[in-house]
Amino acid sequence: GEVLSLEDEDLIEEADVLITLSNQGYIKRLAQDEFQAQKRGGRGVQGTGVKDDDFVRELVSTSTHDHLLFFTNKGRVYRLKGYEIPEYGRTAKGLPVVNLLKLEENESIQTIINVTKDQVADHYLFFATRQGIVKRTNVNEFSNIRQNGLKALNLKDDDELINVFLTDGQADVIMGTKFGYSVRFAETDVRNMGRTATGVRGIKLREGDHLVGATIVSDDQEVLVLSEKGYGKRTPASEYPRKGRGGKGIITLKVADKNGPLAGLTTVQGNEDIMVITDTGVIIRTSIANISQTGRSTMGVKVMRLDEEAKIMTFALVDAADQKDQEE
């Protein structure tokens, strides 16, 4: 892509836009008014132009002049301004993101973060890796990123980035592992480190275990966990006490043959829908409200029926309103 000079950028109207990235890697920009009209007219998620075997995994509300940071599983970060992502109509599939970003082989976008001008000074990016390593870095360390990306954190060979999220410096973080353990700690337990630092231990993993989810948590939320065999539950976040980082953690899901290992952990308000992807490529959608509220050290209840051999690989939260629109 061409690099616009500042004068050229001034010619681009500052407007609110939505950026969507589909599970199969298609990206596009939608004008906000397209989106609002689409909401009023119903149809919801179908307005995003994705095929049946795909869905919108990242939906970011931003401005044409804001910066978007794209973090990959390999710990690299790429940066685009909102206007650099091509605009498409509602029903168009979009552009393969590899056409915009110089991704390496086996490299995929894990998270997109919108950084507004007023967040640069006092906000942090919090990183969590598969091996339980965490890192916190000031957002302003990511202000000049070349087109072919930058290393956002130093990963060991067998490690990969699981999640990155923006924090205000005062948040609590919760992490969950495949064997069903979790830790919750204040983000300030992780000191601010430079961009190339490796990070510190967030959770002490048992042999063979690895991280499957990490996010910000507060006591007015619920912690949602889902197992590979389709069991799930919601638990009030207050049942997860804040401890220091680096411990072995407490049980977030009793893992047994019946329910299988933990597939993911996130926090919810309770009014969202969830999109679940199995290793056979099936996408199942259900309302969070359908998932029972139970205590922290339980097995959960069957949330969805899976084919005999299928396992849940991952899931994403989506706005529940979309579903209602489709039913009208």
Model-flagged regions — what are they?
Residues 1-328:
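Short, structured "edge-of-domain" segments at secondary-structure transitions
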